Amino acid sequence: MEAIAKYDFKATADDELSFKRGDVLKVLNEECDQNWYKAELNGKDGFIPKNYIEMKAHPWFFGKIPRAKAEEMLGKQRHDGAFLIRESESAPGDFSLSVKFGNDVQHFKVLRDGAGKYFLWVVKFNSLNELVDYHRSTSVSRNQQIFLRDIEQVPQVHGGDRATSLPQQPTYVQALFDFDPQEDGELGFRRGDFIQVVDNSDPNWWKGTCLSQTGMFPRNYVTPVNRNM
């Protein structure tokens, strides 16, 4: 994932990474420490303070969502190529690409070379973002023509009335109750917190960002707000 530096940071230890405000960093690991991430910039990697950066939210990144949950969500999509990227369950620190095709969901391991570049087959990329953009027009599969397309925001139906999906760019909700994550990939928050919604295609669980963390949360714990942030 990518992050934008909010402030300058000068390394004070050999394993830290210096950067300037506005730099775009590649976050390699969000689990090293609750206050520090491991990141890469200009071919160098090291630890950075998490409160100095702002994660770039992407509707296709679902973090530690289980493979079965990915298949359930993508199975509801109408179009081939609907996809998400998640952290690998079998190989911590790696990523998997899950894509709907026909009645199935295919899974691709995102590989990395010694220089830290990402790839599925031959063409390599500096970030997951670049990999995703490339495979919107170049098939992710060698056997079928599968082009990535964003998950569709499906309006939900309640009691016979069709409720319009929340507006995009961006949508915020406010927490009605505290929520403590019970599984990997869930987003914790406190009552009153504002959460940016990045995916609301599932009727029960939405994906959002709060305090630079991204994950899934129960829809009935929040209420929509009109807020420009």
Swiss-Prot record:
Supply the source organism for this entry: Xenopus laevis
One GO biological process term is:
female meiotic nuclear division
Q: Signal sequence span per UniProt?
A: none
Under the heading CDD domains, the entry gives: SH2_Grb2_like, SH3_GRB2_C, SH3_GRB2_N
Family the UniProt entry places it in = Belongs to the GRB2/sem-5/DRK family.
One Pfam family assigned to this protein is SH2
- An example molecular function term from Gene Ontology annotations: epidermal growth factor receptor binding
Name of the protein this chain belongs to: Growth factor receptor-bound protein 2-A
What PANTHER family would the database entry show? PROTEIN ENHANCER OF SEVENLESS 2B
- The SH2 domain, residue ranges: 60-152
Give the recorded effect for G215R: Unable to reinitiate oocyte meiosis
